[in-house]
Amino acid sequence: DNTLYSYEHSHEYGMRSLASYCNRVFGVSEEETEECYKRANKIMMGRIGSETAAMHNRLMRMQCMLELLEQPLFPHARNMYHAYWDTFIQHIQSNPGILEFMKELKKRKIRIGIGTDMTAYVQYRKLEAIGVTSYIDFIVTSEEAGVEKPHYHFFDICVEKAGVRPEECAFIGDNVKKDIEGAWESGLKGIWYTQEKEPPEHRYFPTIRSFRGIDVDEFLK
């Protein structure tokens, strides 16, 4: 999320679809839907915590929204789940150059893995929509690992699946704490993907500003 594609772009469309459903079925305004969604997220975080993939489960979030709205769970929880995710995925747009970058890596026999905080099913759907599945050799989700990034166990599984030493792995991500610092602390080379932000003060990370036009041979040195 936010490395291969823009999460915010798709999330905006997903929330519009969810708000449309809630307005049509319950007479709830877009603003009320947004506020209820945020309240449900806060409640679920309090119950589940922030270190497990279950925190991302939108079905449970929709369930909590319906409880707050005092509306029936059936059939609305699943309908709201699909209203959000189906629209979200329909509007996924890959970040410029990512497909070409992966293609060039595969030409050079580089194994490509996906390391992501989220439930597996949704991430599989996203990857199919982005169009990168033919380049991917393995996937590690926080649902499989049982912990979220930056926990070392998550990165240990990434290294295990890559089949090489940690120092031979590059982990590209957009989140400094979860992706980059987590990778370096586990012995991998963390590479920060950021289009606008600057690294934290007194910290330096290898940085990718755009996947378009990357010199792959130079990148692999």
Language-model regions, residue ranges each:
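N-terminal helical cap/lid subdomain that shapes the substrate entry/recognition surface
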Residues: 1-96
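Asp-based, Mg2+/Mn2+-dependent phosphohydrolase catalytic module
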Residues: 9, 24, 28-31, 75, ...
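Short glycine/proline-enriched coil/turn segments at helix->beta-strand junctions
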Residues: 67-70, 108, 203-204
